[in-house]
């Protein structure tokens, strides 16, 4: 049995989120919470909230025990990019890409 949590349109580059997801993929849920608590990245806050949601889904919807859960899959896909322009000297304009991402966490029970 697996429980899933998805965060869509998170205003953060998927490349930055993947750095944090690589730290917790395959880990026990309690160990992952400890890692995320002391990870000094903005993406850690979003992933922590998403992990809480996935654990709550597992406990409430599937009656799984929190102590036996681990993160089986964790991935971040690119969301839509907001394109903005930054004015520069002599009539020029440079484009700024404000990237977003869709983050998915799947927790399973260890056999």
Curated annotation (Swiss-Prot):
Q: What is the lineage of its organism?
A: Bacteria, Bacillati, Bacillota, Clostridia, Eubacteriales
Which keywords appear in this protein's UniProt record, sorted alphabetically? Ribonucleoprotein, Ribosomal protein, RNA-binding, rRNA-binding
On subunit structure and binding partners, the annotation says: Part of the 50S ribosomal subunit.
Q: Which family does it belong to?
A: Belongs to the universal ribosomal protein uL22 family.
Identify the InterPro entries for this entry: Ribosomal_uL22, Ribosomal_uL22_bac/chlpt-type, Ribosomal_uL22_bac/org-type, Ribosomal_uL22_CS, Ribosomal_uL22_sf
Gene symbol here is rplV
Name of the protein: Large ribosomal subunit protein uL22
Concerning Gene3D superfamilies, the annotation shows: Ribosomal protein L22/L17
Question: Biological process GO annotation list?
Answer: translation
One Gene Ontology cellular component annotation held by this UniProt entry? cytosolic large ribosomal subunit
Q: What does this protein do?
A: This protein binds specifically to 23S rRNA; its binding is stimulated by other ribosomal proteins, e.g. L4, L17, and L20. It is important during the early stages of 50S assembly. It makes multiple contacts with different domains of the 23S rRNA in the assembled 50S subunit and ribosome. The globular domain of the protein is located near the polypeptide exit tunnel on the outside of the subunit, while an extended beta-hairpin is found that lines the wall of the exit tunnel in the center of the 70S ribosome.
GO MF terms on file?
rRNA binding; structural constituent of ribosome
């Amino acid at each position: 049995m697996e429980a899933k949590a998805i965060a869509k349109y998170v205003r953060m580059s998927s490349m930055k989120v993947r750095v944090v997801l690589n730290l917790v993929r395959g880990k026990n849920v309690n160990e992952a919470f400890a890692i995320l608590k002391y990870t000094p990245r903005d993406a850690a806050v979003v992933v922590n909230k998403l992990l809480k949601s996935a654990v709550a889904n597992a406990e409430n919807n599937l009656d799984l025990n929190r102590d036996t859960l681990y993160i089986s899959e964790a991935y971040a896909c690119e969301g839509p990019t907001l394109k903005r322009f930054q004015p520069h000297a002599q009539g020029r304009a440079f484009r700024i890409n404000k990237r977003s991402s869709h983050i998915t966490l799947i927790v399973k029970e260890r056999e």
